[in-house]
UniProtKB/Swiss-Prot annotation:
It comes from Lachancea thermotolerans (strain ATCC 56472 / CBS 6340 / NRRL Y-8284). The keyword S-adenosyl-L-methionine does not apply. Keywords: ATP-binding, Ligase, Membrane, Mitochondrion, Mitochondrion inner membrane, Nucleotide-binding, Protein biosynthesis, Transit peptide. Allows the formation of correctly charged Gln-tRNA(Gln) through the transamidation of misacylated Glu-tRNA(Gln) in the mitochondria. The reaction takes place in the presence of glutamine and ATP through an activated gamma-phospho-Glu-tRNA(Gln). Required for proper protein synthesis within the mitochondrion. One of its GO terms (molecular function) is glutaminyl-tRNA synthase (glutamine-hydrolyzing) activity. This is Glutamyl-tRNA(Gln) amidotransferase subunit F, mitochondrial.
Amino acid sequence: MLKVSARHAPVLRLPRRFYAQKTRVVIGPRLKNLDEIKEYLGKPTWSVEKYLQSSSNGETQPPSRETVEKLLKLSGLPNENVEMFQATLGKQLAFINKVQSLPVDESLDPSHARIIDRNSEALDYESLSCSVEQQETEKDSKMGEVGGSWDGTGLAAISENGFYVLREGLLKNRK
């Protein structure tokens, strides 16, 4: 059924099964009890400190002074403490090189690496308008929401059909 309202554009009302999507986020295998959770959290995989310590051994050279000065200029920072920035950037680059050289376990499912669904569909106007209409009709009484109870133009000096009326020009002595 097509409903035409003075406030909104025409909206096609469809049963929920036509536009509702069920999304479920799967991060990894489900842990069934407290012992499995403790076992999972008790297994250390790797330590950042281990790679930071090994990266400070001088395996990679820090960036040159000219490079650091150029980066400081691009970022708008003063050219003070260039040596400190040079050492810090050297440690960070060594750490990144270590992380990139780590062996990757190919048996792991790469879809578990993200929380957000990688295969999400584009949102179109119809599904957006239907979900807005659904939210308007399904107010939460626990939260004190009452459908149609708020009048956004109720305090306006001049309104017509639920819209504000704006006048152009100087508003001296006008009502």
